[in-house]
Amino acid sequence: MLILFSIVLSACCLIALTSQRYALAAVLLMGFIQDPFRKLVAGEPIFFIVTVGVVFGLLMLKTIQSIGFARSIAPFVNWVDYLYKPLTFFVVVLLIQFFHSLFRWGNVVIGLIGLLSYVAPFLAIIVGYYSVNNLSDVRKFMKVYVSFGLLVAGTVALSFSGFELSVFREVGAGLKIYDQGTILRSFSGIMRTGEIAAWHIATTACLLIVLYTTSTRKHSLLLIASLMVLLLLAIAFTGRRKMLMLVSVFGLCYLFGFFYFRKTLSAVSVFSAGLFVFMAWLAVEYFFPGGYSSDVQNYLARGASVYSDASDRFVELGLKPIQWAYSRVGLFGGGLGIGSQGAHLFQVSSIAGGSSEGGLGKVMVELGLPGLFAIVWLMYAISKYILSCIKLASQPFVSSALMAAVLGFAAFLLVNLLTFTVASQIYGDMFILIILGLVSGFVFALPNLVVNEIKQHSLAQHERSDF
């Protein structure tokens, strides 16, 4: 099995270095197959989870080599100057805390793990920025990702249905959830944990909606509704209910964005939304003609409880960990990596304790108050830039499809930022960080996409006039 994986890894690395057209697909392929291969190898070696980083790293080096190092920071300084100062301050804080971690814990790997978790999305922004020239390129990426995500959802559903395969079990002992007066199993499909599977399935649901709204050929609403039902059920079967909230909030933000920036919702849009809900109901009736079984009801009841528990969980996992972090390491943090995935391998995770469960607490325990300020300042600047991109996309000379894509990506990034505040550990996964960075890069590239779209439109008009 290791030999087969080595062959696939080598092929993906070669594609990343030689093919601009299929490079992102190679990254996605490696990201989705590294977990099932890990399950099938004796001992479940941990190195599998970073192999997607190898493929992505080669693509990043190729990108920087082709454009030059000076141009690699263009996504952050090309269009606005207010990103430069918070980004510079953030980098300075990271470097200080890296050396703090090195001298305090005496292990360079701890600091490198933490550094990678903060830097990876920004490296992916550079790759995403230079990987797309038009909306068609963005849609190709989404199509490949959604295809893999539907596969993950299908394997979760199969696992729930009773198919016991080695590739379907969770890595390690597996997670048991005590809820609804019983013990629920977290089904992970081909991914290594139910939480990882849930995030990718939720992301698939979000991108499927964006794909539909940016398509010039509207596919069957019944098909889309059926796929959404499958995805939402698969999320419920993982037991990771926060991802149901992610999809729900995404849908609300996306709808609000259309209403706010387009100033109105057409009758066709309202009718389509109503028809979509009706088709989803038909799909549920088709899949469960006799009603839900008790097993399904337990998972659905757990999933539904996320909405009533949301405010309490935000306080307990979003805000209180900041105070816990201060009590453990003080105002200036304990150094990079002590709250990151993998810290337990070096006996330092106990320093962070439960304070690293939420995103704000993780930043506080690793980077201290200066790092928390740096993150908030940087997120404000990035949000300001993304808002300017949305305003640009809402102009009459920009196609509605490009507007829909930018709104969708902005909503997707927003809900992930909110989820990070209460569940940071999932965002220590290399593949997830790469996906978030790539999507951010697509948004950062919007001015380029608009210019290219106008050029293509002008060229088409010129050709028609000549004809």
Give the positions of each predicted feature.
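Hydrophobic transmembrane alpha-helices and their immediate junctions
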Residues: 367-416
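A membrane-periplasm/extracellular boundary helix in multi-pass inner-membrane enzymes
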Residues: 160-164, 238, 255-307, 323-328
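A conserved mid-to-late transmembrane alpha helix and its immediate loop/hinge
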Residues: 193, 240, 349-386
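Interfacial loop-to-transmembrane-helix boundary motif in multi-pass membrane proteins
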Residues: 29, 79-91, 119, 127-158, ...
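Long extracytoplasmic/lumenal interhelical loops at the membrane interface
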Residues: 293, 298-367, 390-393
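Transmembrane alpha-helices of multi-pass inner-membrane enzymes
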Residues: 60, 206-209, 247-252, 381, ...
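Alpha-helical transmembrane segments of multi-pass inner-membrane proteins
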Residues: 8-13, 95-98, 140-170, 179-182, ...
